[in-house]
């Protein structure tokens, strides 16, 4: 099975969000590894922390508040991968 799903995590580098970003990336790799073709980490600014799958935003710090629960983000990724 060829994985075609791409996850993108855009985070505020100037805010020091690297630990949360790396923790989430690791959790997603452990949970979905072979089902993903890539997990792209994009340093940004302005308090940004966003997670998208195949271009669809599934979590935004500004929209949803905070970093989000990793279990909830994994559920959203799972839903997106399912269909």
Pin down the residues of each PLM region:
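Non-catalytic, surface beta->alpha helical segment in thiol-disulfide oxidoreductase systems
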Residues: 58-82
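Generic domain-boundary/flexible-linker signal
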Residues: 18-20, 50, 62
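Structural micro-motif
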Residues: 44-50
């Amino acid at each position: 099975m060829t994985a075609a799903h791409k996850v993108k995590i855009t985070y505020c580098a100037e805010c020091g969000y690297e630990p949360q970003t790396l923790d989430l990336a690791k959790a997603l790799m452990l949970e979905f590894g072979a089902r993903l073709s890539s997990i792209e980490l994009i340093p940004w600014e302005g308090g940004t922390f966003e997670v998208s799958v195949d271009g669809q935003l599934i979590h935004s710090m500004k929209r949803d508040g905070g970093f989000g629960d990793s279990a909830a983000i994994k559920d959203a990724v799972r839903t997106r991968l399912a269909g």
